[in-house]
């Protein structure tokens, strides 16, 4: 941490006088007040779930459609048959192809954020698993990225569909907007994430599924949010 950042961060820490929970509205207001950098900082949340991982235990991995997106541009590639190239092009995909795209990925040319594949092309994805898997780019039916409906998949990804997944300690983090977003848009996105997570609660989990929730900005400090019952 450089001196300039360290001095700024210490000043921000001085503003956090206690560890009391905040209402979502108050927490957003304080996070925004602390956004003193010149760029449009991301507004991020981190959640602690009642889902610590052990071998062969279920992992929460799903997608949530943020009503207002998160302010980040997503570059989408579509792997499809030659007969569907025009459909992929018209869908708004940034990259599209069949064998040529496979060859590009094999050679390490991965200049996209999300990859959509038609079902029939998945049989050719085997050799790409070792390349795409570690990067979290492997198409997955559960996440809506293996589908015959190319137009819908690309539209969803472009309009704010994001993947959420917990780590081995039960923590989950995602971006829900930018400083420039109105409070109402951030709140709407936050509620969409919370609603989706509650729907994914495993039947064997007793008690609260979300143990704690924090909100912060790219260069700011975090505030604990009091979740509504």
Predicted regions located by residue number:
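Intrinsically disordered, compositionally biased charged tails
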Residues: 1-19, 26, 86, 183, ...
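Translation machinery proteins
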Residues: 22-25, 29-84
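Residue-level signature of catalytic and energy-coupling elements of molecular machines
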Residues: 27, 88, 133, 215
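Flexible, glycine/charged-enriched surface loops at secondary-structure junctions
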Residues: 39-43, 200-212
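Flexible glycine-/small-residue-rich
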Residues: 47-49, 80, 119, 176-178, ...
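Glycine-rich active-site/cofactor-binding loop and its immediate structural neighborhood
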Residues: 68-106
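Short flexible coil/turn linkers enriched for glycine and charged/polar residues
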Residues: 70-72, 82, 167-170, 206-209, ...
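Long, charge-patterned amphipathic alpha-helical coiled-coil/hairpin "stalk" segments used as oligomerization
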Residues: 94-197
